[in-house]
């Protein structure tokens, strides 16, 4: 295992992201070609009419304002209608370069594998070392505790990997629709959709960066534990399991942290509100069920008491035989 040839998370990531990235490139190219003609025509008409009104004095605006608007139109048109320009300044930065730069700055792994693969493989290698050093009858307990330890690490890695894949898949969909939302920035009535798109793009980018940072930090912590000297599995088992559980809980909280850092993404706010509604419905259902159970119990007890009274009255009416 020292060569890190087994990389399950990196392989699964490739199976998921490679076709999605191809679909994103196709979508960006198709949208750029589709909106190129109408957007260029609208830009030319707007610049001509706006410039004519400013030149003739029909609009009380300066040439500086005209130049600012022309620069905005040129930039937006170039970003929305040119797929290569969009890929260079949007897709490559938010989908690849930013996350890779932060990962390379924080990650000191001796292998180019995914950080979760590195954690899993190092844990498995250390477990095999402890198992090989145990005596014959102790191997059963070492194997049991080692299996539980590896399961805890697997749960931690799967939780982080799911959050990472969720952020990357969401980025694929958001970036794929980028040319359309960028073109909406030209009009005051639709500029709010571009602002929402930028907020959501930053939200999931921050989420992806947080996953890389937390994964690297937890990797260093686990490796610090695994690199220590342990005479038995009983000393190695507790810290690894506790760190894995804490890491899984932190990964679960990352979407909320990313949403707060990006001033609130619409998806997570909706998810939190939906979760609150579901919790309220469940608690209301539980209260209703408890009240119904109490009502049924009181009804049954009342029926039983009435039956007992009737039985006593019947015994008194019959008298002695």
From Swiss-Prot:
One GO CC term, this protein: plasma membrane
Q: Which residues cross the membrane?
A: 30-50, 59-79, 142-162, 169-189, 206-226, 231-251
Q: Which Pfam families match?
A: TrbL (PF04610)
**Which membrane topology describes this protein?**
Multi-pass membrane protein
Where does the UniProt annotation locate this protein?
Cell inner membrane
BP terms from Gene Ontology: protein secretion by the type IV secretion system
Q: Does the keyword Metal-binding apply?
A: no
Keywords of the record, alphabetical order, are: Cell inner membrane, Cell membrane, Membrane, Transmembrane, Transmembrane helix, Transport, Virulence
Function of this protein? Component of the type IV secretion system VirB/VirD4 which could be a major virulence determinant for subversion of human endothelial cell (HEC) function.
Its protein name is: Type IV secretion system protein VirB6
Q: Which organism is it from?
A: Bartonella quintana (strain Toulouse)
The gene that this protein is the product of is virB6
